[in-house]
Every structure is written in structure tokens, then in C-alpha cells.
Amino acid sequence: MKNKRYNHIEEWANTLSHGIGILLGIVAGYFLLEKASENMEPQWAVACVSVYLAGMLSSYVSSTWYHGSRPGKLKEVLRKFDHGAIYLHIAGTYTPFTLLVLRHAGGWGWGIFAFVWLSAIAGFILSFKKLKEHSNLET
């Protein structure tokens, strides 16, 4: 995949919007954790919401850092983290659903949870691999 070059204004807008996402995520996290602690299974709910928040914030933090950095070697590495963190964000989003809603559904919850997280880990790792042009594997 070709590296898209953003102009200065686009980079500034990306940095600002993702930085705002971090702040809003922290605020929302407080309310989500508060609500989770009132759940019938508070330990499960708080753990699942924490995983969700970690995935979401990893995505916003890595993206903010990537878009806010100057061109160079560091930016190239941060781009890989930015792309890899999307997989963690997706898996974190599935976690509350699979372990709070589906956990007692005859193995479906744990099965989907394992599949999603193994896929996310594979995607994260592939984000750091240099693939041949026109490879069937891309992140």
C-alpha cells in the first residue's frame, strides 16, 4: 500500500480531531466505568469496558502521535502503530458484547472473543511487516 502524504493542514486537522477523541474517550470512559460498576456482574462489566477503553484510546493516541509528528523515521514507525491500533480498537469493541452478552450462550461468546482477538493480534503484527507489492495480505 502506498503511503499517502497529507498536507500540513490535513495533518493538523487529523491531530486535532484525534486529540479531541482522546479527551472525549476519557470523559466517556468515566461514565462507562461508572455504569459498568452498577452491572449485575460488575467485575466482568468493568473488565470488559476497560478493555474497550484501552483499545479505543490506543487507536486515538497512536493516531494523534502519528499525525502530529514530523516526517522521518519516527513517523514511519508511528504509522505502523496507528494502523495496528485499529485492530485493537475493533477487538476491544467486540469484547463487551462477546463477554457480557454472549458469554453464557453455549460457547459462542468465548469463541467469537478468541477469534476476534487472534485476528486482531495477527492484524497488529502484519501492520509491522513489509509485504510485497500486490500481496493478498494487507492491513
Feature locations, PLM:
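Multi-pass alpha-helical transmembrane bundles in non-GPCR membrane proteins
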Residues: 1-139
